[in-house]
């Protein structure tokens, strides 16, 4: 099921399972996972997209390998909260994933996560070249940590 309400998503999250997070891009997907206590997000990897079938297959494999129980996907809302065309594409992707794998999926506003990731890497002394290779997984980590903070306040 696709959730926008953190209260409803919280009810669907299996206990003692990680949460996987995706920062969707046209060419790549940043991936992060929570720990099993669902308190801390950790950047995992960047996946370079191929086609919808291969993308879904790869994401399902690492979902299982990392013992995840649910998914968070960053949703790039406009400043005024409206959905962009890219949001609609992401929602379609999420619905395909849900239909194929029956996984609880939460859409988290990802506003400014890429800017925050780039700034964090810059002040940490990471080169621009390396930063461009890893900023998507750092963005996924930021998006997931926002969600974890939100659901842990609710608990």
Swiss-Prot record:
EC? 3.1.-.-
Provide any one GO MF term from the record. Answer: nuclease activity
For whether the record's keyword set contains Oxidoreductase, the answer is no
Enumerate the UniProt keywords alphabetically. Cytoplasm, Hydrolase, Nuclease, Ribosome biogenesis
What residues form the membrane-spanning segments?
Answer: none
Q: Which Pfam families match?
A: RuvX
GO cellular component terms, alphabetically, are: cytosol
- Protein localization: Cytoplasm
> What range does the record give for the signal peptide?
none
Hydrolase among keywords: yes
Q: Which Gene3D superfamilies match?
A: YqgF/RNase H-like domain
A GO biological process held by the record: rRNA 5'-end processing
Where mainly located?
Answer: cytoplasm
What the entry lists under CDD domains is as follows: YqgF
Mind telling me which InterPro entries this protein's record contains? Answer: RNaseH-like_sf, YqgF, YqgF/RNaseH-like_dom, YqgF/RNaseH-like_dom_sf
Role according to the record: Could be a nuclease involved in processing of the 5'-end of pre-16S rRNA.
Database matches in HAMAP family: Nuclease_YqgF
Family note = Belongs to the YqgF nuclease family.
- Report what the protein is called: Putative pre-16S rRNA nuclease
């Amino acid at each position: 099921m696709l959730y926008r309400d953190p209260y409803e998503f919280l009810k669907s999250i299996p206990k003692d399972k990680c949460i996987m997070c995706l920062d969707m891009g046209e060419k790549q997907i940043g991936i992060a996972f929570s720990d099993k206590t669902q308190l801390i997000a950790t950047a995992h990897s960047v996946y370079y997209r191929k086609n919808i079938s291969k993308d879904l297959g790869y994401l399902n494999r690492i979902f299982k390998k990392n013992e995840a129980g649910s998914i968070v996907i960053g949703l790039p809302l406009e400043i005024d909260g409206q959905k962009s065309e890219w949001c609609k594409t992401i929602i379609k992707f999420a619905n395909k994933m849900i239909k194929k794998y029956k996984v609880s999926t939460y859409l988290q506003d990802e506003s400014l996560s890429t800017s925050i990731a780039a700034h964090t890497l810059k002040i940490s002394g990471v080169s621009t070249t390396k930063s461009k290779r890893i900023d998507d997984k750092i963005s996924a980590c930021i998006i997931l940590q926002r969600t974890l903070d939100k659901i842990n306040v609710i608990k």
